[in-house]
Amino acid sequence: EDVKEELKNYRYIYVWTGNDYLVYQSNPDYRKYNMQKYLYRLSADFQQILNIYEIPNWITQMAFIDDKIYISTKNVYPKKDGDRVIGISSDDYGIYYSTDYFEWRKLDFEGYDLIEFRNQLFVGNNLCFNDDVIKILYETYSGYPKYKVGQYLCEIDYRNEYKTDNNTVLAFSNDGIYWAYMIVDKANIQGISELGDEILIQKDYRNYYACNKEEVFSQLREKLPNNPVYVKFNDDILGFDEPPIIEDGSTLVPMRFLFEQMGADVEWDSETQTATATLDNKAVTFSIDNVNARINNKPAKMDVPARLINGKTMVPLRFLSENMGYDVDWDDDNRTAIIK
């Protein structure tokens, strides 16, 4: 009965599982930093505590994928000046998962921002599969996805080049890899949500701006690929600013970010639209819209030429990678080019 009374406290978050509720404390109590923490299972009618589970630490976020529950945790403890509490500190961040709520396994990764999207778990700039963590290397995107709006992940991008003191840049993605940006002529935005046919942009606890959801989604469908191609480089996923495309069976990717990962130097002649990439003792020269190339100053021919798309030089992935000394495989099921 004491626990049932405690769960009436406003500091608890209730998560509906489809049959009952999982309940955890939303505002960690620093006074209990060295005590056992718990997760509660509550009946659908709120009348019965079905189970009490021990958890590794205070829960900050929760997600369900297939038969697993994932929790983001942290420890909160008092910061003291002598015997006087002068603040609150937190540390020991971790991501755990369980299939039975009793035994928890920790991901070998230090992080705390998690979100489930399309049955995948994103932790910061990482994609997690059970015990495996795949890092996403973004070309310029610098945020962590925190919101879900319809079929899109969303984030407030504070470091975007178009951010000013008088606006807010919102980043949207339909896969967590490639992002499109929308500028909102409002400053100090605190959060994003949706209600019916509208997207709500929260300025503070009382004030919201509303915009038509379908108008926003229509713009995003034009900017983001519907059937994207992915690139893995040394087991990391590359989050290009301009998503790769396929032309006549060849994958074209943004030149500069790919070569940066390889450690290659690139020289660009804007007058002739010709690039030369150099890595160790290898040099490849090619031009926009021209299948003729040179490898170590010897003539060669590409299956498709490099293209200039939305200001990005897009180059044939296999030709450039293999001539830089890398192997390229194609995962047809996941539409992924794998460079090693």
Label each region the model flagged.
Residues L42-S43, S98, N130, S173, ...:
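Conserved Ser/Thr-centered positions that define the repeating blades of beta-propeller domains
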Residues D2-E5, Q48-Y53, W104-L107, I134-Y138, ...:
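A short beta-strand motif characteristic of beta-propeller blades
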Residues Q190-E222:
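Blade-level signature of beta-propeller repeat domains, shared across WD40, Kelch, NHL, RCC1
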Residues F217-K340:
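Primary recognition of N-terminal secretory signal peptides and signal-anchoring hydrophobic helices
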Residues N34-Q36, S90-D92, N166-N167:
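A detector of repeated loop/turn-to-beta-strand junctions in beta-rich toroidal repeat architectures
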Residues V3-T17, P56-D66, F109-N119, T140-G150, ...:
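Repeated scaffold domains used in trafficking and secretory/extracellular systems
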Residues F46, Y101-E103, V133, G176-Y178, ...:
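Short coil turn/linker residues within repeat-based beta-strand modules
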Residues R11-V15, D20-S26, R31-K32, K68-T73, ...:
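Short beta-strand elements that form the blades of beta-propeller/WD-repeat-like
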